[in-house]
Amino acid sequence: MDDDSSDGTYDLLLSASGQDKRIRTYRSPAKGIVDALNFGIGRSRTRFIARMDADDRMLASRLRKQFDYLSAHPETDLVASQVLHKSDEDDLSSSGFSHYVEWSNQILTEKDIDLAQFEESPVVHPSVMYKKDLLATYGGYRDGPFPEDYELWLRFLSKGAKFHKLNDILLEWFDSSGRATRNQSQYSQEAFQYTKALYLKSWLIEKGLDGKSICAWGAGEIATKHAKILSQNNIRIKKFYDIDPLKIGKTVDMAPVCNIEEISLRNHEFLLILSGARSIKPKIRSFLNKKKLIAGEHYLFLA
């Protein structure tokens, strides 16, 4: 798929398709990744869809390994792979994207993905292969104020689709300061939080947790902004927990702010983690585990 390129890419693709009849080249009739994806998928003649960006590189074994996995595991709807973060810009080698890749590469099993889906995107878009039937059943990529791939994953998962990730690096994912995910509003943190809120309510209902009192870890600026987005999607935070003595005892939108030491199974609450730097997350998990709280049953990371 050529999405309005102006650097000779289309001619290069035509040349390749002339040498290998398995390659078919199309130009997207409109501009933008969503239109290009849906247009290309609509012209595919296969059970499975795999894609990647023009600046990424996949290992020669990628398609075979993913095809074989889906063929051998018909209960699985989407299979991803681990990825290697690559950049020619030194200041991006230790950026948030590289930390995200490190996190994502540890999210492998169906259970891992279910618990991680609202923390960040659990699979890297150019690393996936999935059943084309998913799109016919649940709809294709959507254009809107949200990341089109993350919204699609949450939609699939909300319908019961099964995801798996191979414990194998099969893609080199190239990063640059000019990439869309760094510069377009639909990939902002606020857009991700909005997308999470759209699907979290149905997840809580599916897990039988909607009857519990929904509380939040964090009462700072980032957490309260996230809480407002949740409220707009019918998820009302009844109580906030924090460690800051200047916040404890106050209220946020009429909800009390309490000390994290008051967190207890006896409260019959479900806790949404709305704040916490990457380096702090293991400490939060350890704290909650010591209080006998179980991820997915008593708490869930949303940040």
Regions picked out by a protein language model, each given a short descriptive name:
Residues 2-11, 53:
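A conserved acidic beta->alpha catalytic loop
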Residues 4-6, 26-33, 37-38, 57:
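Short, acidic/glycine-rich phosphate-metal binding loop used to engage nucleotide
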Residues 10-14, 46, 59-71:
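Short alpha-helix within the catalytic core of nucleotide-sugar-dependent glycosyltransferases
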Residues 20-22, 33-41, 65-69, 73-134:
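Flexible acidic/His/Gly-enriched loops in nucleotide-sugar-dependent glycosyltransferase catalytic domains
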Residues 42, 100, 104-184:
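Conserved nucleotide-sugar donor-binding catalytic segment
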Residues 49:
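Short aromatic/hydrophobic "clamp" motif used to bind/position activated sugar donors
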Residues 53-57, 82:
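The conserved acidic donor/metal-binding loop of glycosyltransferases
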Residues 118, 149, 153, 172-303:
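Hydrophobic, well-ordered beta-alpha structural blocks that scaffold small-molecule cofactor pockets
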